[in-house]
C-alpha cells in the first residue's frame, strides 16, 4: 500500500520524517520539497541507519528559491529501498517555511529476507 509522509519545517532542526518499522521495508517512489518562504533557503534530505551510519544524502543543502520546488522521481518506478530501522530525515535553515513530502510503498518482509539485510 502506498503512503505519503508530509512535514513542514520552519527552523534548522534535523527532523525524522519516519522510521521503517520492524519486519518491513519500504520502496520510495517520489520526493517533493517546496519552499513557501519569500527567499532562497536550503533543503536537505537523507536516509541512514538508526544510529546515523551508512548515510545517503538525497539533497544536501540544496538551494530552493522562494516559491520554488524540488522533485525527485523515476517515472513511476522505484528509486530507493530502505530496510527495517532505517530513518528518513529532513532539514532546512532558520526562518524557513519548507515542506517535505515522501511517497513510499510499505511492504512486509518475506521470512526469507529477514536475515538478509
Task: Describe each PLM feature range.
Residues 4-7, 59-62, 77-79, 89:
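Beta-strand-rich interaction surfaces with strong enrichment in secreted/lumenal proteins
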Residues 16, 41, 56-57, 70, ...:
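Short beta-strand segments
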Residues 7-13, 63-73:
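Extracellular carbohydrate recognition and processing domains
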Residues 38-61:
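Short, surface-exposed beta-strand/strand-loop-strand elements in extracellular ectodomains
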Residues 1-26, 30, 36, 84, ...:
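C-terminal interaction-tip segments
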Residues 67-85:
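Beta-sandwich interaction modules
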Residues 46, 88-91:
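Short conserved beta-strand and strand-loop elements enriched in small hydrophobics
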Amino acid at each position: 500500500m502506498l503512503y505519503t509522509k508530509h512535514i513542514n519545517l520552519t527552523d534548522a532542526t534535523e527532523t525524522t520524517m519516519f522510521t521503517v518499522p520492524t519486519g518491513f521495508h519500504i520502496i520510495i517512489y517520489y520526493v517533493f520539497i517546496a519552499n513557501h518562504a519569500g527567499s532562497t533557503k536550503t533543503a536537505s534530505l537523507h536516509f541512514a541507519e538508526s544510529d546515523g551510519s551508512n548515510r545517503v544524502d538525497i539533497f544536501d543543502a540544496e538551494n530552493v528559491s522562494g516559491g520554488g520546488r524540488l522533485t525527485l522521481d523515476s517515472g513511476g518506478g522505484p528509486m530507493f529501498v530502505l530496510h527495517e530501522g532505517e530513518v528518513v530525515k529532513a532539514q532546512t535553515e532558520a526562518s524557513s517555511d519548507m515542506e517535505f513530502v515522501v511517497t513510499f510503498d510499505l511492504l512486509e518482509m518475506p521470512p526469507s529476507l529477514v536475515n538478509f539485510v
